[in-house]
Amino acid sequence: MTKSEKIIELTNHYGAHNYLPLPIVISEAEGVWVKDPEGNKYMDMLSAYSAVNQGHRHPKIIQALKDQADKVTLVSRAFHSDNLGEWYEKICKLAGKDKALPMNTGAEAVETALKAARRWAYDVKGIEPNKAEIIAFNGNFHGRTMAPVSLSSEAEYQRGYGPLLDGFRKVDFGDVDALKAAINENTAAVLVEPIQGEAGINIPPEGYLKAIRELCDEHNVLFIADEIQAGLGRSGKLFATDWDNVKPDVYILGKALGGGVFPISVVLADKEVLDVFTPGSHGSTFGGNPLACAASIAALDVIVDEDLPGRSLELGDYFKEQLKQIDHPSIKEVRGRGLFIGVELNESARPYCEALKEEGLLCKETHDTVIRFAPPLIITKEELDLALEKIRHVFQ
């Protein structure tokens, strides 16, 4: 039995089976490349679901983490830490928002945004108590906690978890008329992924996000953009909402915000929204901790200094066009923005992901029939060409 096989056996024996990973163990990683315990090398084309946009173990981020670990790692929010203010300023200026509320995971940030929207609805908009509604979209994925599960359109995500939470409506993604019909006097917010990731890299129709912005303005409704996966350069823009030149009332960020070395998420909004929180109304012991802030400050610097959105845009266009040239009866469509690309098949994508793994390329199926390609944004054109060679070989 190999070391990898032993690790997988232990994992399957002791771990809850809430994931179905490819049969590979990763023990080392740097940049775009990872290794298993046997020394086999693989190209990472998933980036931990876009948490590693800056590449594995980016030296600037790792050094920031090490330096901070030598000083202080956690004080809780009972006291001030010396880098939280610096992080607040950096992320707020980057997003063009007044205030930030840090959490740890993407789902926590979504829950935070939903709580903010409801309290804003009652305290600012004046909706009758316990009547506020939030509109989401079919195909959405906002996390695995109870509120995101309750607003999901996937039956399997909800099975066995009832009773689900009330106060959510769902409409079809891309349908302006359906959204217009769903908005009423009790609508507090519209929650949308500018690009639906888990649904199969679904790109909204041109002008759709702008239409959401206009409807929200017309009806005094908060526009909440879940940019956890598509944001911070992944789509070829700093924020995926930038594709329609719109600014949401609320940004939700996570994943690459911590550079792939420490979990951190954030809700960003102006004072009118985040000032609804008062001491004791929301919190997190680890939210905005010194280690997370140190990693995030460095992670944001890397995104800006190395122009990762620009790299993603240029290389993503090239990669997408090359993928479109692969002639295979199983390929239904190639779509995406930046280095956030889905190859939709007429059959299950899992066998193709397994075959690509054997070729030394790691990716993951999403929504059963879509292969998601989302490499670290530091990838080179030469590395993309190598990936294309492997992809062509599998489809041949």
Swiss-Prot record:
Pathway entry: Amino-acid biosynthesis; L-proline biosynthesis; L-glutamate 5-semialdehyde from L-ornithine: step 1/1
Any GO BP: L-proline biosynthetic process
Regions crossing the membrane: none
Cofactor(s) annotated in UniProt: pyridoxal 5'-phosphate
GO molecular function, one term: pyridoxal phosphate binding
Compartments where found: Cytoplasm
N6-(pyridoxal phosphate)lysine modified-residue sites: 255
Disulphide bond pairs: none
Keyword Ribonucleoprotein: no
Major location category of this protein: cytoplasm
Recorded superkingdom: Bacteria
UniProt catalytic activity: a 2-oxocarboxylate + L-ornithine = L-glutamate 5-semialdehyde + an L-alpha-amino acid
EC number: 2.6.1.13
Alphabetical keyword list: Amino-acid biosynthesis, Aminotransferase, Cytoplasm, Proline biosynthesis, Pyridoxal phosphate, Transferase
CDD domains attached to this UniProt entry: OAT_like
GO cellular component annotations of the record: cytoplasm
The protein's role, per its UniProt record: Catalyzes the interconversion of ornithine to glutamate semialdehyde.
UniProt similarity note: Belongs to the class-III pyridoxal-phosphate-dependent aminotransferase family. OAT subfamily.
Protein name: Ornithine aminotransferase 2
Organism: Staphylococcus aureus (strain Mu50 / ATCC 700699)
